[in-house]
Amino acid sequence: MTIMRKTHPLLKIINHSFIDLPAPSNISSWWNFGSLLGICLMIQILTGLFLAMHYTSDTATAFSSVTHICRDVNYGWLIRYLHANGASMFFICMFIHVGRGIYYGSYMLSETWNIGIILLLTTMATAFVGYVLPWGQMSFWGATVITNLLSAIPYIGTSLVEWIWGGFSVDKATLTRFFAFHFILPFIITAFVLVHLLFLHETGSNNPSGLNSNSDKIPFHPYYTIKDLLGVIFLLMVLMILVLFFPDVLGDPDNYTPANPLNTPAHIKPEWYFLFAYAILRSIPNKLGGVLALVLSILILATFPLLKSSKQHGLMYRPITQTLYWVFISNLLILTWIGGQPVEYPFTTIGQIASISYFTIIVILMPIANMIENNILKLYY
């Protein structure tokens, strides 16, 4: 008798995606992060759903409703901190996932890569509107500063900002619509994830060697389900250590003060996962130029398939580009650090150098390194 999972219309889809899926036999633990992102998304949707049951999206009661969740709701503190720190874990996994894609040349699966960029942008939008909801000082001023950047768009900028605010400042209408966006966006992300997987399963996964692995495939289950399970256990362990021992280490103390439009915090800054882009934004003195650099800092990922001219796939056997890659990662960490520092010397200068380096490495140095490596290959082969 034929196994039900292979014949049932619904189970058949799950079977082809997670059980009998042919996967390369040599993919390393760097390929675990896709499944970890799926787990993070499920944690965020579930904890978010329970938080939404008790949260009120009104400027008068938003802050106190979050306090009520932490103090009066059974395990409300746990749900709230799981949600807040779950977002940080989500971004850590996402940055590693993108970094692995760049290192091993996964961007050559262009449809999957481009949907991934859309997913990254959508997740960043979701996290931004979510950060506004507790209605603390940093929530309010973060929302004011970031949405106000749209006023840099010529001609329609000011009208666009007022349209998003629902008035002449960040107020009740803004909070209500941000809550609506924050609720719906994770489901849009889930839909994009399915499209991401659809495109991935059309071509099959990349692998560390960068060679075609069609001649050497193994079933996803049990091999990679067990391997992924180890990653999931490790992820949950780190998340629970964060939640139970250091719940506020990644947050901002200013957000424990209710929003006050009459009092500006000393240093307005977003959550840590946006600091690299924020540093790039601040390093350009012109407002419109800063906004363009901010957007390009993410959209530049789309240029990777276009700028690749190397004969080899991935950076495994390309020492020059490999060195540039790690310089790029170090540069990202410097930008993240600078984004959290006040706007004064020497931080502004370091930020400007790091911002120029960020774009130079991708657009100029990596393509040059590709050409050099190709010429070295020609000499020996």
Swiss-Prot record:
The lineage of its organism: Eukaryota, Metazoa, Chordata, Craniata, Vertebrata. Gene3D superfamilies: Cytochrome Bc1 Complex, Chain C. It is a multi-pass membrane protein. The cytochrome bc1 complex contains 11 subunits: 3 respiratory subunits (MT-CYB, CYC1 and UQCRFS1), 2 core proteins (UQCRC1 and UQCRC2) and 6 low-molecular weight proteins (UQCRH/QCR6, UQCRB/QCR7, UQCRQ/QCR8, UQCR10/QCR9, UQCR11/QCR10 and a cleavage product of UQCRFS1). This cytochrome bc1 complex then forms a dimer. Keywords: Electron transport, Heme, Iron, Membrane, Metal-binding, Mitochondrion, Mitochondrion inner membrane, Respiratory chain, Transmembrane, Transmembrane helix, Transport, Ubiquinone. GO terms for cellular component: mitochondrial inner membrane; respiratory chain complex III. Its cofactor is heme b. Belongs to the cytochrome b family. This is Cytochrome b. It is found in: Mitochondrion inner membrane. Heme 1 (or BL or b562) is low-potential and absorbs at about 562 nm, and heme 2 (or BH or b566) is high-potential and absorbs at about 566 nm. One of its GO terms (molecular function) is ubiquinol-cytochrome-c reductase activity. Heme b b566 binds at H97, H196. Its main location: mitochondrion. Heme b b562 binds at H83, H182.
